């Protein structure tokens, strides 16, 4: 399994490898070049002694290299999660959420690969097979332990992604609450002003008698003072109530 980061997405490449093990032979089948197979082949060509311990030991060499290739992938994902965790607090965006879901999908794909491999290695390390030398079981046991640790790392990374997702949603909700709070305060401060300006701005009738006093200069200044002092008073009152 190989994972490559391409912008905001991750491309997961999974190549199927079939291995047939016999008493004195080992056959591998794969559609694309696999680094672990090529490295083992080159090692056997450089030093023929690598083939003298039996086909089962050669299987161990191949499997060990295959499992070792998971670590760079795990490190890539771990580094990506650290970067996203910083983005969650500094500049969360829909793109951040997309990255979290992509990483979660990649980790789920890795888990589906690790679990069957772990079971196979557990059988090779514990069960009796004619094609497996008992002295080589300890090597397969070592690979099984590596797969167990990789599975645990995978679970830890999935927990980190889930935690980052929860944190992202909390940050977005808090920001939304702050926006709604600000808009509510602005609306509350200007509501009395809207009422006063609307009431004194009505032109439905001509002022007569005592109502003529409403259009005098002193009334204008009184209303203007109320329009200025009322928002200030409401602001001070909200501050004392610790609403701001």
Q: What spans do the regions from the language model cover?
A:
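Peripheral, non-transmembrane regulatory/ligand-interaction domains of membrane transport proteins
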Residues: 1-142, 146-151, 156, 214, ...
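Hydrophobic alpha-helical transmembrane segments and their immediately adjacent juxtamembrane loops
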Residues: 145-244
């Amino acid at each position: 399994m190989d994972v490559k980061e391409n912008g905001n997405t991750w491309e997961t490449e999974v190549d199927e490898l079939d291995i047939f093990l016999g008493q004195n032979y080992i056959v591998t089948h794969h559609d694309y070049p696999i680094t672990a197979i090529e490295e083992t082949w080159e090692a056997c060509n450089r030093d023929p002694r690598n083939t003298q311990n039996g086909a089962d030991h050669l299987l161990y060499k191949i499997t060990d290299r295959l499992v070792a290739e998971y670590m760079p992938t795990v490190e890539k994902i771990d580094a990506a999660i650290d970067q996203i965790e910083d983005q969650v607090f500094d500049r969360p965006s829909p793109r951040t959420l997309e990255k979290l879901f992509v990483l979660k999908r990649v980790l789920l794909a890795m888990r589906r690969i690790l679990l069957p491999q772990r079971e196979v290695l557990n059988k090779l390390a514990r069960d009796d097979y004619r094609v497996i030398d008992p002295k080589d079981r300890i090597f397969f046991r070592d690979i099984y332990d590596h797969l167990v640790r990789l599975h645990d790392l995978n679970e830890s990374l999935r927990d980190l992604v889930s935690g980052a997702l929860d944190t992202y949603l909390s940050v977005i909700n808090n920001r939304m609450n702050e926006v709604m709070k600000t808009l509510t305060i602005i609306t509350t401060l200007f509501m009395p002003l809207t009422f006063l300006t609307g009431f004194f701005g009505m032109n439905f009738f001509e002022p007569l008698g005592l109502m003529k006093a409403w259009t005098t200069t002193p009334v204008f200044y009184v209303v203007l003072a109320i329009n200025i002092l009322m928002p200030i008073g409401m602001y001070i009152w909200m501050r004392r109530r610790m609403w701001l």
